[in-house]
Amino acid sequence: MTLRLGDVAPDFEQDSSIGPLKFHEWAGNSWVVLFSHPADFTPVCTTELGLTAKLKPEFDKRNVKAIALSVDPAEKHAAWISDIEQTQDTVVGFPIIADEDRSVSSLYDMIHPNASTTATVRTLFVIDPAKKVRLSLTYPMSTGRNFDEVLRVIDALQLTDGYTVATPGNWKDGDDVIIPLTVQDPEVLKQKYPKGFTAARPYLRVTPQPNK
């Protein structure tokens, strides 16, 4: 099935590197980064999971849980985790789903037949505590993901969930933000944006990040 932004991320139960896992129950009230990789014991995937492991403190600060997926069995995941930890100098503190029957891969449309009929492509979903899909990214098998960008988008989503703002191109935490066009009333502008704003055009109003 095709998952669109705002859709509820489907629940599932599947084996994993930490045993049988019920997805929604495991996710709890956290944000989730769910990402698939083509296969265990492959070079690009090893670097990606190593990076994810090293970013655990950053994920923790944002109330984010990471979970990976491939169609390899749990026993193979366990052996590969040892390799990841040795070669990437880290500890893998997140589960890897063992989707041998490809049920989760199909549910999340992670197998693209024109890329591979059996292996999952590099799909990534950011899912919020309400289990809604907030970001969907798909990378080709030859290209590793940019996890700094994943963190940047999570920062933007969490900021815009809490404040009536939008983030401009290349925004990063601490930069100025945009006032949405839906806010026009002068009194509301004063109330919501006490730091003031500058307007390059009536539709382009910039204000300091409200929680900084």
Protein language model annotation of sequence segments:
Residues 1-212:
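Chalcogenol-based redox active-site neighborhoods
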